[in-house]
A protein has these predicted regions:
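N-terminal amphipathic/basic-hydrophobic helices that include classical n-h-c signal peptides
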Residues: 1-10
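Positively charged, low-complexity intrinsically disordered leader regions
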Residues: 12-13, 17
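Cofactor-binding active-site loop characterized by glycine-rich and histidine/acidic residues
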Residues: 28-31, 43-175
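Short acidic, glycine/serine/threonine-rich loops at helix termini
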Residues: 87, 115, 165-167, 193-197, ...
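Glycine/aspartate-rich loop-and-adjacent alpha/beta segment that forms the canonical ThDP
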Residues: 224-282
């Protein structure tokens, strides 16, 4: 009986995450279409990972107290995926869902990239690729020096890894044995102008990260069981930082957007949005 209850609870969690990710994708389409700009492709692709991070018991936070001292720190180094992050914050009751409609509006707290001083959940302004990871390493080092239990999570894009500053940060994280740092990479193989491998070769990515002293974990970024297991494994790792490579699909959930780099930073038309929302409702 106890086993059946555990299984039922686990299945309930997975369904909760699937529903949340679906609603996040709907929000991404609606808010970027209303704004007429933004980055819907990658946001649709990372939705499952963000849902697991915020609703799967991975990230420690208090919805009503964004500056809680016991919180885990989250840095969105690939800051253009803000639509997905805002949608996750709404699902986690950190911000009102109605506020999502203000994306990129003058005076809105929800700017196109994270801006410190707008939302209290923004730990650092990001968007210039390759910079957020350095700050995340600094926060993790500070936690270590103060002997604090807080963990640091840093979201990165695979195209972002073309920036040399990322690798300097990885080297420092390894040098200081920052096992309180979990880096996760959105490996969709695409960036603004095409395929990552055609612009700057990243493979063998796992081996490269490992050579910098990181504990590398590979996972399907659309399989919640794998996503949660990867975060759990990273948390259990001692003596070195972890890097999770999440294999994802840009534009996930919308057939005409999937695996197409053209949707990196282009909003949908009203007609396209209606079709996308129809697919996401199925």
């Amino acid at each position: 009986m106890q086993y059946l209850l555990i299984v039922k609870k686990a299945l309930g969690m997975l369904e909760k995450l699937r529903q949340a990710a679906r609603e996040m994708r709907v929000a991404v389409v609606k808010m970027t279409t209303a704004a007429g700009s933004g980055h819907p492709g990658g946001s649709l692709g990372i939705a499952d990972v963000f849902a697991a991070l915020y609703l799967g018991g991975v990230l420690k936070f208090k919805p009503g107290d964004a500056r809680w001292k016991g919180r885990d720190y989250f840095v969105l180094s690939n800051g253009h995926l803000n639509p997905a992050w805002y949608a996750a914050l709404a699902q986690a009751k950190c911000i009102p869902e109605r506020e999502l409609t203000t994306l990129r509006q003058l005076g809105s707290r929800l700017q196109g990239h994270p801006v410190r001083g707008t939302l209290p959940q923004v730990e650092v302004s990001t968007g210039s690729l390759g910079q957020g990871i350095g700050v995340a390493v600094g926060i993790a080092l500070g936690m270590k020096m103060e002997r604090l239990p807080n963990r640091v999570y840093c979201s990165m894009g695979d195209g972002e890894l073309e920036e040399g500053s990322c690798w300097e940060a990885f080297a420092a994280a390894s040098h200081y044995k920052l096992d309180n740092l979990t880096i996760f990479i959105d490996r969709n193989g695409l960036q603004q102008n095409g395929r990552t491998e055609g612009i700057m070769t990243l493979e063998p990515l796992a081996e490269r990260l490992s050579s910098f002293g990181l504990n590398v974990i590979n996972a399907d970024g659309h399989d919640f069981t794998q996503i949660l297991a990867a975060f759990k494994k990273a948390r259990a790792t001692k003596g070195k930082p972890s890097a999770i490579i999440f294999k994802t699909t840009m534009g996930k959930g919308v057939s005409f957007m999937q695996a197409k780099h053209e949707w990196h930073g282009k909003a949908l038309s009203q007609t396209q949005a209606a079709e996308a929302l129809k697919e996401l409702a199925q």
